[in-house]
Amino acid sequence: MIKEFINIIESMEGITDDWFRTGAFETYKHPTPIHYKTAIANGTVNTLEGPVDYQAGHKIITGPKGEQYPVNPQKFAEYYDDNKDGTATPKKIHKHAKLADHDGVVKASWGNLNYKAGEDYIVRHGAGDYGVVKKDIFKQTYDTTNDKSI
């Protein structure tokens, strides 16, 4: 997942805003607190989608399966309410998501994130801003009421 918050450069496989026009549904993250640490130095974390670089000050979030992913401080403040105890609660922000219909790579400025057809959801946070979420994690952390694929 940011695994969950990625600015797309462009994917040869066609993940663009237009890709979401058919088959996407409205969703939001459940308000279940997540755990995080603040990076004190630059580094790399191995996300479920591949290695991702981060900088000092980025928040390293631990997901429901123990997976980790970095989020820059601005995105963190935009998408989470900091509980000031090493946890944060996702804000209820409506987004669009779609189950990947092809294998590919989301190319972010800090690394490539792989996704597989039928195994990963692509979440559209805003124009040109996407995240990749494993299917089982998506079902645990996002509202799936409007998902016609399940």
What are the language-model segments listed below?
Residues 3-64, 73-129, 136-140, 144-150:
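A motif-centric signal for short, conserved binding hotspots located
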Residues 69-70, 133:
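Signature of WW domains and closely related Tyr/Trp-rich beta-sheet microdomains
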